[in-house]
């Protein structure tokens, strides 16, 4: 078979002194970190959509990329050609996983019948590619936001026929994910929100979205899918306000519909930025709420109000993210999917490799910094000492419901409590983190 990336055999680890731009300097899949292979900690995935579907177009210009599989021709044949290039890329990049939306891998067609037939054929192609390459599916999902029919949302659409079309896509994509051995299924509500409250019934739309999620959970159990269901929070774009705004908002939504034990979160760094949060905050919040599942690893631009989907390159924040994930026990079914794209001016086909290689090295360094933090344990000890009082008699009686509000007030009066503020020592802790980051 003719190769597309014909100037490259495979990206390999060459060590930190390497000057080869098509080699890893820090990501060594077999290196042991806290007793586990680096590849097994990080569980990298490359995404289909930004890497093979985007043509370089933006709001002010047409596509700038020359991708042979995006040329005019038979749609199904172009999809197969795209799959050839995609799996060549996955293999040469040395990623163990990939992710897709339904219409990333298969032509949508002009009807539901065409959609289903095309997707069924491409699932056969993908299954064969997976078997040949050893690359596995981290997660699949359905694109229920691009087609004009979804202008007013999919699950939250005022037309139940649109809801039904979306439900068909979701059930088909879930079945495909299950058939391909996918380890998760993602729900991202690209247009599940509103642009103006003047024509929006908030209660109605929340009920519709909640019902779709309940149906998804029911179908998961019906088909015996053992993977994890994930929601990917995002505050806005393309709508003004989305119902899955951030980790905390999604938790409240899931609680409302009794789904908090059925669905977890896929946290994206850039979406955290858009919500006014740090990536670290959203990961820590998801873990605290028992909802952490997987990560879309990228970065946004704090000076821009949209999803820039750049490759991660900030070890300072990503190390803290990996530290939180380490403390939570690491990934189970989730992983680090690079929901990132090269810039519109990056028109060389090997730019796809440069972006992913830099991102993988960044996350590898972040992993090793986080491991140093875990091994040293000082940051954890500082936090434990700060809350130590809650492990004492008073703290435990309050938390365990053994004291009423009046009991607590009586205790404070009887013991003449006069507590004094203790320093949070933020500056010292920031210096400690810098020690892990920069001291060898």
Curated annotation (Swiss-Prot):
<comment type="subunit">
    <text>Homotetramer.</text>
</comment>
<dbReference type="GO" id="GO:0000287">
    <property type="term" value="F:magnesium ion binding"/>
</dbReference>
<feature type="binding site">
    <location>
        <position position="296"/>
    </location>
    <ligand>
        <name>Mg(2+) 1</name>
    </ligand>
</feature>
<feature type="binding site">
    <location>
        <position position="271"/>
    </location>
    <ligand>
        <name>Mg(2+) 2</name>
    </ligand>
</feature>
<keyword id="KW-0859">Xylose metabolism</keyword>
<feature type="binding site">
    <location>
        <position position="268"/>
    </location>
    <ligand>
        <name>Mg(2+) 1</name>
    </ligand>
</feature>
<dbReference type="GO" id="GO:0009045">
    <property type="term" value="F:xylose isomerase activity"/>
</dbReference>
<keyword id="KW-0413">Isomerase</keyword>
<dbReference type="GO" id="GO:0042732">
    <property type="term" value="P:D-xylose metabolic process"/>
</dbReference>
<comment type="similarity">
    <text>Belongs to the xylose isomerase family.</text>
</comment>
<dbReference type="InterPro" id="IPR013452">
    <property type="entry name" value="Xylose_isom_bac"/>
</dbReference>
<feature type="binding site">
    <location>
        <position position="268"/>
    </location>
    <ligand>
        <name>Mg(2+) 2</name>
    </ligand>
</feature>
<feature type="binding site">
    <location>
        <position position="339"/>
    </location>
    <ligand>
        <name>Mg(2+) 1</name>
    </ligand>
</feature>
<feature type="binding site">
    <location>
        <position position="232"/>
    </location>
    <ligand>
        <name>Mg(2+) 1</name>
    </ligand>
</feature>
<dbReference type="InterPro" id="IPR036237">
    <property type="entry name" value="Xyl_isomerase-like_sf"/>
</dbReference>
<protein>
    <recommendedName>
        <fullName>Xylose isomerase</fullName>
        <ecNumber>5.3.1.5</ecNumber>
    </recommendedName>
</protein>
<dbReference type="GO" id="GO:0005737">
    <property type="term" value="C:cytoplasm"/>
</dbReference>
<dbReference type="InterPro" id="IPR001998">
    <property type="entry name" value="Xylose_isomerase"/>
</dbReference>
<keyword id="KW-0479">Metal-binding</keyword>
<feature type="active site">
    <location>
        <position position="104"/>
    </location>
</feature>
<keyword id="KW-0119">Carbohydrate metabolism</keyword>
<feature type="binding site">
    <location>
        <position position="307"/>
    </location>
    <ligand>
        <name>Mg(2+) 2</name>
    </ligand>
</feature>
<keyword id="KW-0963">Cytoplasm</keyword>
<keyword id="KW-0460">Magnesium</keyword>
<feature type="binding site">
    <location>
        <position position="309"/>
    </location>
    <ligand>
        <name>Mg(2+) 2</name>
    </ligand>
</feature>
<feature type="active site">
    <location>
        <position position="101"/>
    </location>
</feature>
């Amino acid at each position: 078979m003719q190769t597309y990336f014909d100037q490259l055999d495979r990206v390999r680890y060459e060590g930190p002194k390497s000057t080869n731009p098509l080699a890893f300097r820090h990501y060594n899949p077999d290196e042991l970190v806290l007793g586990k292979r680096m590849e097994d900690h990080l569980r990298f995935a490359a995404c289909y959509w930004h890497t093979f579907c985007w043509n370089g177009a933006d709001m002010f210009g047409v596509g700038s990329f020359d991708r042979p599989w995006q040329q005019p021709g038979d749609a199904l044949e172009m999809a197969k050609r795209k799959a050839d290039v995609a799996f060549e890329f996955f293999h040469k990049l040395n990623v163990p996983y990939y992710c897709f939306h339904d219409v990333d891998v298969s032509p949508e067609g002009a009807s539901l019948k065409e959609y289903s037939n095309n997707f069924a054929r491409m699932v056969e192609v993908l299954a064969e590619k997976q078997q040949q390459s050893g690359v596995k599916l981290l997660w699949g999902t359905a694109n229920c936001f691009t087609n004009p029919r979804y202008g007013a949302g999919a699950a939250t659409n005022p037309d139940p026929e649109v809801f039904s079309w979306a439900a068909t896509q979701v059930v088909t994509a879930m079945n495909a994910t299950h058939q391909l051995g996918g380890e998760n299924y993602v729900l991202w509500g690209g247009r599940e929100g509103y642009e103006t409250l003047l024509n929006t019934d908030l209660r109605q739309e929340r009920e519709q979205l909640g019902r779709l999620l309940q149906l998804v959970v029911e179908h998961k159990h019906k088909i015996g899918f053992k993977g994890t269901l994930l929601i990917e929070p995002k505050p806005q774009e393309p709508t003004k306000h989305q119902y899955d705004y951030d980790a905390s908002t999604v938790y409240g939504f899931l609680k409302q519909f009794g789904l908090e034990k059925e669905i977890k979160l896929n946290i994206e760094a850039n979406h955290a930025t858009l919500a006014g949060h740090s990536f670290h905050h959203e990961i820590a919040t998801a873990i605290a709420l028992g909802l952490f599942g997987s990560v879309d690893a990228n970065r946004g631009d704090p000076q821009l109000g949209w999803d820039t989907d750049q490759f991660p390159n900030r070890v300072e924040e990503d190390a803290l993210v990996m530290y939180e994930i380490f403390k939570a026990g690491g990934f189970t079914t989730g992983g680090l999917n690079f929901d990132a794209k090269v810039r519109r001016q990056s028109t060389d086909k090997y730019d796809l490799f440069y972006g992913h290689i830099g991102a993988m090295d960044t996350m590898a360094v972040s992993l090793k910094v986080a491991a140093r933090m875990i091994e040293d344990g000082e940051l954890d000890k500082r936090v434990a000492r700060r809350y130590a009082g809650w492990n004492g008699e008073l703290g435990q009686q309050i938390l365990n419901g053994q004291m009423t509000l009046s009991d607590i007030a009586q205790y404070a009066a009887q013991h003449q409590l006069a507590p004094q503020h203790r320093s949070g020592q933020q500056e010292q802790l920031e210096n400690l983190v810098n020690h892990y980051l920069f001291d060898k």
